[in-house]
């Protein structure tokens, strides 16, 4: 497997990306990470598993995250998040011509990936969403939502602590330690970022019947960060192109949780079935 890094521009901001290429490539996964983390966190489990199975991976650090320039936890607008995926799909097509491209989004990245497929390009072969942030698994205090609404009108770029419960990401304690020690992980989010993500999550649920792309949706039933019930609602409203898999007792980061091997194997089998179905 070879690793190559690159930069690209969206909204005048340089975003950092990389792609991982196995010797034999039969498909490409475009990976979209979640809030407060970065794309290289997937190098421990997801990337080696996929490349070992002849699936190339291309990923990038979103606005305000990882090695991408800009204010931590803030983006210039939701449409620019979709523009970044447009550019990455174009790059993936040039790097791996005629190979099927699958979009894979986790948490906030799942929100963005789902909305991309509903609102924009439908040329990708399939969509994978893990623990997508369609709704939070908890209700923020009313005062906090009121404050966020006020700040969004006067200072939408101001960032506040995300208050993410680190212990909720995985049942594997070593993963919690790794998360806390990662220098590129942060806990900042702007009011404009968080409110727009939640708005787009509700929009996605409402428009779920319009999903035309084959989709694999996975969520843990003990996810305390994003709502597995919202994922179930999305799947129930969508057509039969959406397959939902629930992991009983699973925490937020299924790819770092106790059943990660089972979860990754499901992704592999699903990708291969989509490739076979298109022949």
What are these regions (language model features)?
Residues 213, 227-236:
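Short alpha-helix in the alpha/beta-hydrolase fold that links the catalytic acid
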């Amino acid at each position: 497997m070879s690793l190559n890094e690159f930069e690209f521009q969206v909204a005048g901001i340089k975003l950092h990306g990389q792609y991982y290429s196995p010797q034999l490539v039969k498909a490409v996964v475009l990976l979209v990470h979640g809030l407060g983390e970065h794309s290289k966190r997937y190098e421990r489990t997801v990337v080696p598993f996929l490349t070992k199975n002849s699936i190339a991976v291309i990923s990038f650090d979103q606005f305000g995250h990882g090695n991408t320039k800009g204010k931590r936890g803030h983006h210039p607008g939701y449409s620019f998040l979709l523009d970044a995926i447009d550019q990455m799909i174009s790059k993936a097509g040039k790097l791996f011509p005629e190979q099927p491209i699958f979009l894979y989004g986790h948490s906030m990245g799942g929100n963005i990936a789902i909305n991309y497929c509903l609102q924009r390009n439908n040329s990708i072969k399939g969509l994978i969403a893990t623990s997508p942030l369609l709704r939070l698994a908890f209700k923020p205090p009313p005062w906090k939502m009121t404050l966020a609404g006020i700040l969004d009108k006067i200072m939408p770029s101001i960032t506040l602590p995300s208050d993410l419960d680190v212990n909720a990401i995985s049942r594997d304690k070593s993963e919690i330690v790794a998360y806390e020690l990662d220098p590129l992980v942060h806990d900042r989010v702007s009011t404009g970022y968080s409110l727009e993500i939640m708005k787009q999550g509700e929009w996605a649920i409402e428009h779920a019947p319009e999903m035309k792309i084959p989709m694999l949706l996975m969520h843990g039933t003990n996810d305390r960060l994003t709502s597995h019930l919202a994922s179930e609602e999305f799947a129930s409203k969508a057509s039969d192109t959406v397959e939902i898999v629930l992991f009983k007792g699973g925490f937020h980061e299924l790819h770092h949780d106790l059943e990660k091997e089972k979860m990754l194997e499901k992704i592999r089998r699903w990708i291969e079935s989509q490739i076979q179905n298109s022949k």
